[in-house]
């Protein structure tokens, strides 16, 4: 995959003609506000009401820390140091990017926001993370970003990921946004940070009918044609599943070639769908898919595997 920075002349020329934006960058404040509202709405009378409420509180903590302690400009992302070639190679690749220690400052702030609301179980997790050394927390983060989930407490992973995601989301705001993909390679991971998607979202409005995959880490969305499997690019054996009806706003797209699946959210059927919240709230669809022998290809920041299970 390559990402090319457009000169101003091309940007202006393209503005007057329809095109499918290759990348959609999140507005951090709006993203968290929408997520909080959606979690609140979906939690009403839901079998997992308590956990959805907890997830909403984590998003509230992320929003509060974003507003109170925004990170400074990273000098590595200055225009002088970040070339078009750099942008073409997953510029914020989660396993290559050397994290600034500020991510741990964000983590401590998120834990402080959560502490007054925490029940005994959550409080124990928070206090354990607080007692760890910086090196221990960095080690957990390394394993988490490498998807070595079997070595990590799923309860701790939620908070570590929340801080990492808040850090990466702000880094994305610091790179040029006037860029686009020139090839369709490796679209099963985020072209910015190389992380897995949460779900795909079928847009309405200006991007009517276009499919975008939503990154679980940096929250960027990237365009991928709907005729391909999001995991293996094959086209011949795609099926769609839902729990209630054919016009459901949340479906699972499965692939008979790689035997994986990823949720698809349809804004036309419910304009309020939100990648992380709706994916988590539709967990019973995941159960159905796993019973069919299919493996989830996406990653939800509130659904890490439990190594003790």
From Swiss-Prot:
A GO molecular-function descriptor: ferric iron binding
The keyword Lipid metabolism belongs to this UniProt entry's keyword annotation: no
Cell location: Cytoplasm
GO cellular component, one term: cytosol
Any GO BP annotation: protein maturation
Keywords: Cytoplasm
Keyword Transferase belongs to the record: no
Domain of life of the source: Bacteria
HAMAP family associated with the record: FdeH (MF_00611)
Family assignment from sequence similarity: Belongs to the FdhE family.
The protein's role, per its UniProt record: Necessary for formate dehydrogenase activity.
Name this protein carries in UniProt: Protein FdhE homolog
């Amino acid at each position: 995959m390559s990402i090319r920075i457009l000169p101003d002349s091309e940007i202006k020329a393209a503005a007057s003609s329809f095109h499918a934006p290759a990348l959609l960058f999140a507005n951090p404040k709006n993203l968290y506000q929408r997520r909080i509202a959606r979690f609140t709405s979906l939690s009403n009378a839901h079998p997992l009401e308590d956990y959805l409420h907890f997830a909403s509180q984590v998003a509230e903590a992320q929003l509060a820390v974003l507003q109170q302690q925004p990170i400074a400009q990273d000098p590595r992302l200055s225009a002088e140091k970040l070339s078009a070639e750099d942008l073409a190679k997953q510029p914020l690749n989660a396993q290559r990017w050397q994290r600034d220690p500020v991510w741990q400052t964000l983590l401590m702030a998120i834990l402080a926001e959560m502490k007054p609301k925490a029940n005994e179980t959550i409080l124990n997790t928070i206090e354990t993370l607080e007692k760890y050394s910086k090196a221990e927390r960095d080690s957990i983060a390394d394993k988490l970003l490498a998807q070595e989930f079997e070595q990590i407490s799923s309860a701790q992973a939620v908070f570590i990921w929340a801080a990492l995601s808040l850090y990466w989301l702000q880094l994305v705001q610091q790179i040029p946004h006037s860029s686009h993909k020139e090839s369709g390679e490796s679209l099963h991971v985020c072209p910015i940070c190389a992380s897995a998607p949460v779900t795909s979202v079928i847009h309405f409005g200006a991007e009517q009918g276009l499919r975008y995959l939503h990154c679980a880490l940096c929250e960027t969305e990237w365009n991928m044609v709907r005729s391909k499997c999001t995991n293996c690019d094959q086209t011949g054996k795609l099926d769609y599943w839902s729990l209630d009806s054919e016009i459901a706003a949340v479906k699972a797209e499965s692939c008979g070639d790689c035997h994986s699946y990823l949720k698809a959210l349809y804004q036309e059927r419910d304009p309020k769908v939100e990648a992380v919240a709706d994916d988590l709230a539709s967990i019973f669809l995941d159960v159905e898919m796993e019973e069919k022998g299919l493996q989830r290809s996406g990653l939800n920041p509130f659904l890490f595997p439990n190594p003790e299970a």
